[in-house]
Amino acid sequence: MSMQDPIADMLTRIRNAQMVGKTSVTMPSSKLKKSVANVLTEEGYVAGFNATDGVKAELTIDLKYFEGKPVIAELDRISRPGLRAYAGKDELPTVRGGLGIAIVSTSKGVMTDRAARAAGVGGEIICTVF
C-alpha cells in the first residue's frame, strides 16, 4: 500500500517519538524530508539528522529535549495533498507572533518563513513548528 502523504507521516513519527521520550526516530527518506529535517536542525528544533542512501534509503532524526520536555511543542501539517496551501511573499504566516516557524517550499529551496521573506519569495507552506 502506498503512502498518501509522506510529510504528514514524517511529522507524526516525530510527534509520536517525542511523546514517548525516544532519542531518535527513523523513517523512509526523500529529498523533501531531508530538506525539512535540515531546516528543523538549523532552527534548533532537533539535534541533527542522518540520511542513508541505497535501495532502502532511511532518514534518522535525533530528537531534542529541554529539562525532560520535547523542544517541539506543536508540529502541524498545513499544505496537504487534498488542499494545497500557497502564500506569496507578503502573505507568509507568522507562527505564534514570530516565536515559531513555518517551513516553506519555494523556488529557491525549502526554508523558514523568515528566510523566504528576506529572499522575497513565496511558496507552499509545508508545516508550522512551535
Curated annotation (Swiss-Prot):
Lineage, highest ranks first: Bacteria, Pseudomonadati, Pseudomonadota, Gammaproteobacteria, Cellvibrionales
Keywords: Ribonucleoprotein, Ribosomal protein, RNA-binding, rRNA-binding
NCBIfam families in the record: PRK00136.1
InterPro entries, sorted: Ribosomal_uS8, Ribosomal_uS8_CS, Ribosomal_uS8_sf
Keyword Protein transport attached: no
Gene name as annotated: rpsH
Any one GO MF annotation of this record: rRNA binding
This protein's name: Small ribosomal subunit protein uS8
GO biological process, one term: translation
TM spans (from-to): none
Family from the record: Belongs to the universal ribosomal protein uS8 family.
Domain of life according to the entry: Bacteria
Organism whose genome encodes this protein: Teredinibacter turnerae (strain ATCC 39867 / T7901)
Keyword presence, Iron-sulfur: no
Assembly and binders: Part of the 30S ribosomal subunit. Contacts proteins S5 and S12.
HAMAP family from the UniProt entry: Ribosomal_uS8_B
GO cellular component, one term: ribonucleoprotein complex
One Pfam family recorded for the sequence: Ribosomal_S8
SUPFAM superfamilies: Ribosomal protein S8
Function as written in the Swiss-Prot or TrEMBL entry: One of the primary rRNA binding proteins, it binds directly to 16S rRNA central domain where it helps coordinate assembly of the platform of the 30S subunit.
